[in-house]
Amino acid sequence: MINIVTFPGLGLEFSLNRVAFHLFGRPIFWYGIIIASGMLLAVYLCSRWAPRFGIVPDHILDMMFFAVPAALVAVRAYYVIFNLDLYRRGDGSLDWGAILRYSDGGLAIYGAIISSVIVLLIFCKVRKVSFLSFADLGVHGLFIGQLIGRWGNFMNVEAFGSTTTLPWRMCGTSIAEHLLQSGYVDQAGYEAVLSGALGVHPTFFYESMWNLAGLFLVY
Protein backbone atom coordinates (compact mmCIF):
# COMPACT_ATOMS: atom_id res chain seq x y z
CA MET A 1 0.00 0.00 0.00
CA ILE A 2 1.37 3.39 -1.01
CA ASN A 3 0.83 6.33 1.34
CA ILE A 4 1.22 9.86 0.03
CA VAL A 5 2.51 12.20 2.73
CA THR A 6 2.86 15.91 2.07
CA PHE A 7 4.30 18.91 3.85
CA PRO A 8 2.35 21.66 2.03
CA GLY A 9 4.08 24.52 3.81
CA LEU A 10 7.47 23.20 2.72
CA GLY A 11 6.46 22.10 -0.76
CA LEU A 12 7.43 18.47 -0.06
CA GLU A 13 5.64 15.27 -1.09
CA PHE A 14 6.64 11.67 -0.37
CA SER A 15 5.27 8.41 -1.74
CA LEU A 16 5.81 5.86 1.02
CA ASN A 17 5.52 2.09 0.87
CA ARG A 18 5.80 0.23 4.17
CA VAL A 19 7.20 -2.80 2.34
CA ALA A 20 10.83 -2.58 1.20
CA PHE A 21 10.85 -5.92 -0.64
CA HIS A 22 9.60 -9.50 -0.40
CA LEU A 23 11.74 -12.43 0.73
CA PHE A 24 10.45 -15.95 0.13
CA GLY A 25 7.01 -14.50 -0.37
CA ARG A 26 7.01 -12.58 2.92
CA PRO A 27 7.07 -8.78 3.10
CA ILE A 28 10.11 -7.13 4.65
CA PHE A 29 9.09 -3.78 6.10
CA TRP A 30 11.11 -0.59 6.11
CA TYR A 31 10.27 -0.17 9.80
CA GLY A 32 12.18 -3.31 10.72
CA ILE A 33 15.10 -2.45 8.44
CA ILE A 34 15.42 1.03 9.92
CA ILE A 35 15.12 -0.20 13.52
CA ALA A 36 17.74 -2.90 12.88
CA SER A 37 20.04 -0.34 11.22
CA GLY A 38 19.77 1.94 14.24
CA MET A 39 20.53 -0.92 16.60
CA LEU A 40 23.54 -2.10 14.59
CA LEU A 41 24.98 1.41 14.38
CA ALA A 42 24.44 1.86 18.12
CA VAL A 43 26.25 -1.40 18.88
CA TYR A 44 29.13 -0.51 16.55
CA LEU A 45 29.65 3.00 17.94
CA CYS A 46 29.22 1.92 21.56
CA SER A 47 31.84 -0.79 20.99
CA ARG A 48 34.21 1.90 19.72
CA TRP A 49 33.46 4.16 22.69
CA ALA A 50 33.44 1.41 25.35
CA PRO A 51 37.06 1.88 26.58
CA ARG A 52 36.22 5.48 27.56
CA PHE A 53 33.78 4.02 30.09
CA GLY A 54 36.00 1.21 31.29
CA ILE A 55 33.91 -1.36 29.43
CA VAL A 56 35.35 -4.29 27.48
CA PRO A 57 33.92 -4.04 23.92
CA ASP A 58 33.15 -7.78 23.81
CA HIS A 59 30.85 -7.33 26.80
CA ILE A 60 28.53 -5.24 24.63
CA LEU A 61 28.00 -8.07 22.15
CA ASP A 62 27.59 -10.54 25.00
CA MET A 63 24.95 -8.37 26.61
CA MET A 64 23.12 -7.80 23.32
CA PHE A 65 22.85 -11.58 22.87
CA PHE A 66 20.39 -11.52 25.77
CA ALA A 67 18.99 -8.00 25.42
CA VAL A 68 17.75 -8.29 21.82
CA PRO A 69 15.47 -11.34 22.30
CA ALA A 70 14.13 -9.84 25.52
CA ALA A 71 13.42 -6.54 23.74
CA LEU A 72 11.59 -8.27 20.88
CA VAL A 73 9.19 -9.75 23.41
CA ALA A 74 8.96 -6.63 25.57
CA VAL A 75 8.13 -4.14 22.80
CA ARG A 76 5.08 -6.20 21.87
CA ALA A 77 4.11 -7.08 25.44
CA TYR A 78 4.15 -3.44 26.55
CA TYR A 79 1.93 -2.38 23.66
CA VAL A 80 -0.52 -5.24 24.17
CA ILE A 81 -0.81 -4.69 27.93
CA PHE A 82 -1.72 -1.03 27.48
CA ASN A 83 -4.06 -1.72 24.55
CA LEU A 84 -5.57 -4.96 25.78
CA ASP A 85 -9.07 -4.24 24.50
CA LEU A 86 -7.75 -4.33 20.94
CA TYR A 87 -6.87 -8.00 21.41
CA ARG A 88 -10.09 -9.29 22.94
CA ARG A 89 -12.61 -11.42 21.11
CA GLY A 90 -16.33 -10.76 21.30
CA ASP A 91 -16.63 -13.05 24.34
CA GLY A 92 -13.91 -11.13 26.19
CA SER A 93 -11.18 -13.76 25.81
CA LEU A 94 -7.76 -12.81 24.49
CA ASP A 95 -6.97 -13.41 20.83
CA TRP A 96 -3.48 -14.87 21.16
CA GLY A 97 -3.13 -15.19 17.40
CA ALA A 98 -3.53 -11.43 17.03
CA ILE A 99 -1.23 -10.79 19.99
CA LEU A 100 1.56 -12.84 18.43
CA ARG A 101 1.08 -11.41 14.94
CA TYR A 102 3.86 -8.81 14.92
CA SER A 103 3.25 -8.04 11.25
CA ASP A 104 0.01 -6.25 12.16
CA GLY A 105 1.99 -3.58 13.99
CA GLY A 106 1.79 -2.46 17.59
CA LEU A 107 5.20 -2.07 19.25
CA ALA A 108 6.33 0.23 22.07
CA ILE A 109 9.95 1.29 22.59
CA TYR A 110 9.31 1.70 26.33
CA GLY A 111 9.05 -2.08 26.62
CA ALA A 112 12.52 -2.47 25.11
CA ILE A 113 13.96 0.16 27.45
CA ILE A 114 12.53 -1.57 30.53
CA SER A 115 13.65 -5.03 29.44
CA SER A 116 17.13 -3.75 28.53
CA VAL A 117 17.60 -2.22 31.98
CA ILE A 118 16.57 -5.50 33.62
CA VAL A 119 18.89 -7.53 31.37
CA LEU A 120 21.73 -5.09 32.00
CA LEU A 121 21.27 -5.30 35.77
CA ILE A 122 21.47 -9.10 35.66
CA PHE A 123 24.37 -9.08 33.18
CA CYS A 124 26.44 -6.65 35.26
CA LYS A 125 25.75 -8.65 38.41
CA VAL A 126 26.87 -11.91 36.80
CA ARG A 127 29.89 -10.45 34.98
CA LYS A 128 30.82 -8.22 37.92
CA VAL A 129 31.05 -5.03 35.88
CA SER A 130 29.84 -1.54 36.77
CA PHE A 131 26.16 -1.08 36.00
CA LEU A 132 26.44 2.71 36.08
CA SER A 133 29.34 2.77 33.60
CA PHE A 134 27.50 0.40 31.30
CA ALA A 135 24.32 2.46 31.65
CA ASP A 136 26.20 5.67 30.80
CA LEU A 137 27.43 4.04 27.61
CA GLY A 138 24.00 2.56 26.96
CA VAL A 139 22.38 6.00 26.94
CA HIS A 140 24.52 6.83 23.91
CA GLY A 141 23.21 3.72 22.19
CA LEU A 142 19.63 4.59 23.10
CA PHE A 143 19.95 8.04 21.55
CA ILE A 144 21.46 6.59 18.37
CA GLY A 145 18.81 3.91 18.05
CA GLN A 146 15.96 6.35 18.58
CA LEU A 147 17.51 8.98 16.32
CA ILE A 148 17.41 6.53 13.42
CA GLY A 149 14.52 4.34 14.49
CA ARG A 150 11.93 7.11 14.52
CA TRP A 151 12.21 7.31 10.75
CA GLY A 152 10.61 3.89 10.71
CA ASN A 153 7.52 5.62 12.11
CA PHE A 154 7.65 8.00 9.17
CA MET A 155 7.64 5.10 6.70
CA ASN A 156 4.61 3.67 8.52
CA VAL A 157 2.95 7.12 8.66
CA GLU A 158 2.47 6.88 12.43
CA ALA A 159 3.63 8.51 15.65
CA PHE A 160 2.40 11.92 14.59
CA GLY A 161 0.99 14.55 16.92
CA SER A 162 -2.01 16.82 17.22
CA THR A 163 -3.40 19.01 14.46
CA THR A 164 -1.59 22.18 13.47
CA THR A 165 -1.36 24.79 10.74
CA LEU A 166 2.39 25.36 11.17
CA PRO A 167 4.45 25.48 7.96
CA TRP A 168 5.96 22.03 8.63
CA ARG A 169 2.56 20.37 9.17
CA MET A 170 2.28 16.84 7.82
CA CYS A 171 -0.75 15.78 5.76
CA GLY A 172 -2.04 12.70 4.01
CA THR A 173 -5.12 10.60 3.36
CA SER A 174 -4.21 7.95 5.94
CA ILE A 175 -3.56 10.69 8.51
CA ALA A 176 -6.93 12.31 7.81
CA GLU A 177 -8.72 8.97 8.09
CA HIS A 178 -7.02 8.17 11.40
CA LEU A 179 -7.93 11.56 12.86
CA LEU A 180 -11.56 11.21 11.77
CA GLN A 181 -11.94 7.63 13.00
CA SER A 182 -10.33 8.50 16.34
CA GLY A 183 -12.59 11.51 16.82
CA TYR A 184 -9.80 14.07 16.76
CA VAL A 185 -11.42 15.98 13.88
CA ASP A 186 -14.91 16.31 12.45
CA GLN A 187 -15.82 16.06 8.78
CA ALA A 188 -14.70 19.64 8.17
CA GLY A 189 -11.36 18.92 9.82
CA TYR A 190 -11.01 15.74 7.79
CA GLU A 191 -11.47 17.67 4.56
CA ALA A 192 -9.04 20.35 5.76
CA VAL A 193 -6.34 17.71 6.28
CA LEU A 194 -7.03 16.26 2.83
CA SER A 195 -6.70 19.71 1.28
CA GLY A 196 -3.48 20.45 3.17
CA ALA A 197 -4.87 23.44 5.04
CA LEU A 198 -4.64 21.48 8.30
CA GLY A 199 -2.02 18.93 9.24
CA VAL A 200 -0.40 17.22 12.19
CA HIS A 201 2.85 17.71 14.07
CA PRO A 202 5.59 15.40 12.70
CA THR A 203 6.47 14.21 16.19
CA PHE A 204 8.62 11.40 14.81
CA PHE A 205 10.93 14.13 13.46
CA TYR A 206 10.84 16.11 16.71
CA GLU A 207 11.92 13.06 18.70
CA SER A 208 14.61 12.18 16.17
CA MET A 209 16.09 15.66 16.54
CA TRP A 210 15.74 15.58 20.34
CA ASN A 211 17.75 12.37 20.37
CA LEU A 212 20.39 13.93 18.13
CA ALA A 213 20.65 16.84 20.57
CA GLY A 214 20.79 14.41 23.49
CA LEU A 215 23.61 12.48 21.85
CA PHE A 216 25.65 15.66 21.42
CA LEU A 217 25.04 16.56 25.07
CA VAL A 218 26.22 13.24 26.51
CA TYR A 219 29.04 12.51 24.05
Label for each model-derived stretch:
Residues 1-219:
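A feature for loop-to-transmembrane-helix boundaries and adjacent hydrophobic helices
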